[in-house]
Amino acid sequence: MLSLDFNNELIKAAPIVGTGVADVSARLFFGLSLNEWFYVAAIAYTVVQIGAKVVDKMIDWKKANKE
């Protein structure tokens, strides 16, 4: 919920329920917080992309040597 008070120049924002639920459920897996899971996901994504690039280059190298 967002509350704007123009007289006192205040903006009050209550946390979204989904964020709280996501944080609690994230802590159930290995005790990591939500932003730590983002770090894990970013590292895993990077490793997968590097692996995919290596496989792609190996396939290109095999095709070049076959001809």
From Swiss-Prot:
Provide the protein's localization: Host cell inner membrane
Topological domains on the Periplasmic side lie at 56-67
What are the BP-aspect GO terms? viral release from host cell by cytolysis
Alphabetized, the UniProt keywords read: Cytolysis, Host cell inner membrane, Host cell lysis by virus, Host cell membrane, Host membrane, Membrane, Signal-anchor, Transmembrane, Transmembrane helix, Viral release from host cell
Q: Which domain of life is it from?
A: Viruses
- Pfam families in the record, alphabetically? Phage_holin_2_2 (PF10746)
Q: How does the entry describe its membrane topology? A: Single-pass type II membrane protein
Give the signal sequence positions. Answer: none
* Cytoplasmic-side segments: 1-36
So where does this one cross the membrane?
37-55
Q: Would you tell me the Gene Ontology cellular component terms?
A: host cell plasma membrane; membrane
Q: Which GO terms describe its molecular function?
A: pore-forming activity
**Role description:** Accumulates harmlessly in the cytoplasmic membrane until it reaches a critical concentration that triggers the formation of micron-scale pores (holes) causing host cell membrane disruption and endolysin escape into the periplasmic space. Participates in determining the precise timing of host cell lysis. Participates with the endolysin and spanin proteins in the sequential events which lead to the programmed host cell lysis releasing the mature viral particles from the host cell.
Assembly and binders: Homomultimer.
Concerning its family, UniProt says: Belongs to the T7likevirus holin family.
Return the protein name. Holin
